[in-house]
């Protein structure tokens, strides 16, 4: 307890420097697309640095159409090799489509490419090392984890944001006025449970109720999970947790009340809003009770099996696409919690894949053209858009993607029957409103990563107790 008290005291002292930033919000853009959640995220980029060649090219590129960028890319990269790096392997699928598009303009165009996907959070180390070269290896990156992007990549001027003109217009903004990161897509991790038993999960607090041990990727191995916990302390999401708590019965409230009371002073010390104590209580119970897994794939494989009676988890929604039906395994063995008519509270967590040029990009025009292609065309986004649970940040591309792949009827069979209702993706608008998806705000995560982050570090994970 002394260690805990001392740590809280240190955190409280640091709030003098950070409290003002912690209240920063996220500016909504027109069209209510995924751009909304990152509008303010890039506001702390190094403002007084001297403009580099890449900066100047980005400034020009932001006023160009995709076709104009494509012509610049052809001049720059014909006969060369393009290196990209990302958290998603699908850049490797998108690049051949991009090259095919450039060939429609110049049939003689040719470009080799290599796409790398570092494991175990090594992408930040790789980009940092590459930034030290006069001319880098990587032209661009597709990267996740808004907190580390903000603090390690943007505040240090390693990565550069390019906003395609067509993307900005689709979102009702201008490339020059938009100050956030550029999201390719929002991915959602959603609460699910095995429905072959008697357990009921009709409130987000049920996932942290007595005896519940949801399957979840460890917060120290996939850090977007830790960002989810940070975001719960933001006022709007803390309020959502309070509203869900209010709808619990007396028995469940009596279980949670001592925990809420126990963290009330911590919430005040951390400078959180009035309902911050509900967020801390939920976080504490989650961290101390979740069952640690290494990847969302095994979590999905467990939950869809009849042997996982009453088990629950928080995992990437799109994993349901890969389930192979058998006697004991079926998508119908799970329920997406938020799809229940009587469900209350947050339905999951939404995080982004962001696109950047490197500060020393060897092929900046080509990088800009590729970024514009995958954010402004349905074909370009198809490497990701072909599957459920990934939503383009461009509302026009989002609409075209749904029209082509019809994810909202993803569970329907050829006879027009809704065979697997859990695979009927209700889409970004539904998830962010009715589904109460918690959306990552990189700036907020960066602001509270020391204060709330250290508080979380003091908690004892269930895996540490075994």
Where are these regions (language model features)?
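Bacterial signal peptide processing site
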Residues: 23-26
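Extracytoplasmic/periplasmic substrate-binding proteins
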Residues: 278, 288-360
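Short, polar/charged alpha-helical segment
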Residues: 42-48, 66-77, 88-110, 323
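C-terminal motif of bacterial Sec signal peptides marking the signal peptidase cleavage site
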Residues: 17-21
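Mature extracytoplasmic/periplasmic domains
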Residues: 353-437
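N-terminal low-complexity, Pro/Thr/Ser-rich intrinsically disordered segments
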Residues: 35-77, 260-263
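Extracytoplasmic ligand-binding site segments that recognize negatively charged/polar headgroups
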Residues: 80-99, 113-126, 136-298
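Conserved C-terminal helix/tail region of periplasmic/extracytoplasmic solute-binding proteins
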Residues: 51-56, 62, 67, 417-466
